[in-house]
Regions:
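Metabolite-binding pocket within alpha/beta catalytic cores that recognizes anionic/polar moieties
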Residues: 1-136
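Short, well-ordered coil/turn segments that N-cap beta-strands
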Residues: 18, 58, 147-148, 188
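Short Gly/Pro-enriched turn/cap motifs at secondary-structure boundaries
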Residues: 43, 189-190
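Active-site rim beta-loop-alpha module in soluble metabolic enzymes
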Residues: 129-186
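Short glycine-rich, acidic/polar surface loops and turns
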Residues: 191-196
Length: 196
């Protein structure tokens, strides 16, 4: 009580930049922050670890979110309360097309909202799509760095094992049918946060 800190992230306005890189694993934050100029530790609470630093003189932050949409939404809501406005999700995913190889960059032009969190924010018919300028900047960067990349729709889900071992689930046939449909629709990859 009386603190200006956000409840879950323990962040204050002067500790974070307007631009935020989000990653699931708290152990990745320091490594990612090492690419920032003058990076420094800001906070560590629950699954939320934060470092800040500079890119071309602009304050930016790296924040872990834990796994899934719900914990990602908590981080984003608190960061938005502090004035953050641009988020870039960096993490792992599972390729759904044979041409998406390990180590390739997947740039999401949209996400299938097969999770429960975003239903609290928008009707399911509303698509989860990124800001066009941010999407374009990602493609431009991948080209500039000559990295193998793919741009397209991805799947965001709540259950890691439900898609990777659907036969172990009571709703096996439903999960398998959806997976097969997404593959036929040329979905690039599957993960758990980007639709948030």
């Amino acid at each position: 009580e009386g603190s200006n800190k956000q409840y879950h992230t323990q962040l204050e306005e002067n500790g974070v930049g307007d631009y935020v890189i989000l990653t699931g694993d708290p152990k990745r934050v320091k490594d990612i922050a090492s690419y920032l100029d003058d990076a420094y530790f800001v906070a560590d609470n629950r699954e939320y670890v934060t470092y800040s630093g500079y890119i071309n003189g602009v304050l930016c932050s790296v924040v872990s979110t834990g796994i899934g949409g719900a914990s990602t939404a908590i981080a984003m809501e608190e960061l938005i309360q502090l004035g953050c406005h641009t988020f870039l999700r960096v993490g792992t995913c599972g390729g759904m097309r044979l041409d998406v190889q390990g180590g390739d960059i997947v740039i999401a032009s949209g996400a299938i909202r097969q999770e429960g969190t975003t239903r609290e924010y928008a009707p399911i018919e509303f698509p989860a799509v990124p800001n066009f300028e941010v999407l374009s900047a990602q493609v431009e960067s991948a080209n500039k760095l000559n990295l193998p990349y793919h741009v397209g729709v991805i799947q965001s889900k709540d259950s890691f094992f439900g898609q990777h071992a659907p036969e172990t689930m009571p709703v096996y046939q439903e999960l398998q049918n959806k997976w097969d449909a997404y593959c036929r629709l040329d979905c690039l990859a599957s993960e758990m946060e980007s639709s948030t």
